[in-house]
Amino acid sequence: MKKFISRYGKMTLVALFGLCIFLFWYCGYPQALCYQEQNQLFLWSADYFWHDLSVAGGLADYISEFLVQFYYIPVLGAAILAFLFLAFLSLTYQVIRSYTAKPLKWYGMLMALLPSILLLEVMGDIEVLLSFPIALTLALLSTWLMNLATRRWGARIAWADVLLTPVLFWLIGGGATWLYVFLRLAFFLMQVKKGKLPSVAIAYPLSILYLWAIQLICYSTLLVQYPLMSVMTGINYYRVPMQYPGQKWGYDKDLYALLKLNEQVRNGKWEDIIHDAQESQVQVFYTSNCVNLALAQTRQLADRMFSFYQSGENALLAPRSRDNMSMYPTMEAFWRLGLVNSSLRYASDLQASILNGKMSGRLMKRITECQIVNGKYAVARKNIDL
C-alpha cells in the first residue's frame, strides 16, 4: 500500500482534484459561467488584441476573454477551468520543488493544493475575472523557469530579471508580478544562505523598489486614468473598479439563486423556474419578474400568478435600474410581448451598466434582433460583422 501511494499518490491526487473542479463548475455552479460569459464580447481582430495590450495586464485579460467566450457551453467552461486549476496546481508544485531541487513526497502535492483551494474560494466571487488566475499561473510559470535558469547559470541570470520584470508587469498586471518578485526574492535569499550564490546576490531585494518604480512611472505616464492602487495590484482582475478579489467571504444563498434564475431565463428553462420557485423564492422583484415570465411562457400566468411571491406593481415589468442584472427578465418579457423598442432600450441600458466597460455578446445579439425587426438592416449587419 505504501509503495502504491508513493508511486501513484500524486497522480491520483491531481486527477481527483481536476475532477472535483470540473464537477464544481459544471454541476454546482454553472450559473457563474453564464454570468461571466454574458458580461463580455470577445472580438477576433487585431485591433481588439492591441486594445487589450495597451493596458497593464492586457495579455492575461485577452487570454481570459478568449476562453470565457466558450463558457456559453457549460461543459466547455467547466473543462477550461479544470485545466487551468490543474496547471496552477502543477506549477505551484514545480515552484516548491525548485526551492529544494529534490523530488517531493506525495504530501508535497497536498501542500501545493492549499493555494489552489484559496484560489477556488476567490473565484467564487462572481466579479473576479478569469484574468486573475491566468495572471497568477503565468507568474508561477515564469518563476519556475527562472529558478531553473538560476540554478544552471548562477547570479548572472539576475540581469534577465531586470528585463523580465517590466515585461511581466505589462503582460500580466501588478498583483501577479508582485508574486513573481517575492518568489524570486525568496529563492535568491535561500540560495545565498546555502552558499550556492555569491553574497552580492543579497542585493536582489532591490527588485521590490525596481518594480515599484516601474509602476509609478507607468502610472504617471501611460496609465494616468487608473487609480494608483489599481495599477499596483491589477487593473483587470476584478470587474468592479477599486475593489479587489478576496474581500468577500461566505456563501450568499440569495445571490446564487438569482444567478441561477438568470441562467434559466436565458436558456428558456421555464418549467425549472416554476419548480424552483415552489421550493424557495427570494423575495425581490427580480424573482417575481422571472417567475411571472415563466408562467406566461407556459400559459399559467392567469391561474397561478398569485401562488408565488409578487413584489408589487413591478412584479410583471420592472422599471429601469443601474445594474447589469435586474433588467434581463423585463427585457425578455418586452421582446416576447412584441414591444421591440422597449426591449432594445433595456438591452442598451444593460450593456452600458457593465461595470468594467465591456460589451456583451448576449445583449449584442438581442440588440441586433431588435434592429432587424425595426428594418435597420445596415446597423444589424454591422453588429453581426463584429
Label every model-predicted segment.
Residues 3-4, 93-106, 149-157, 190-201:
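Membrane-interface helix-boundary motifs at transmembrane edges
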Residues 71-86:
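Loop-to-helix entry region of an early transmembrane alpha helix in multi-pass inner-membrane enzymes
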Residues 35, 53, 57, 81, ...:
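Membrane-interface micro-motifs in multi-pass membrane enzymes
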Residues 1-21:
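Start-transfer (signal-anchor) and selected internal transmembrane alpha helices
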Residues 30-70, 117-130, 212-242:
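Membrane-interfacial interhelical loops
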Residues 126-130, 148-194, 208-219:
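Transmembrane helices and adjacent periplasmic/lumenal helix-loop junctions
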